[in-house]
């Protein structure tokens, strides 16, 4: 299961969702601006961009890293 943390105005978040859907991979999406805990998590980890994507508990990174991760079959 993939987890996408982003914002409603994030084009790369939409591209990440499309990529996962086109590869029949399950995901959930959460808007970080709606959850103070996620805002704090972003600050604590120094993440300044969205999306931040995980597969289960493994942090993948942004859209480009997700694309590479899927194409290489990691």
Segment roles from a protein language model:
Residues 1-25:
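Local sequence-structure signature of Cys/Sec-based thiol-disulfide redox active-site neighborhoods
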Residues 15, 37, 65:
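Residue-level recognition of oxygen-bearing side chains
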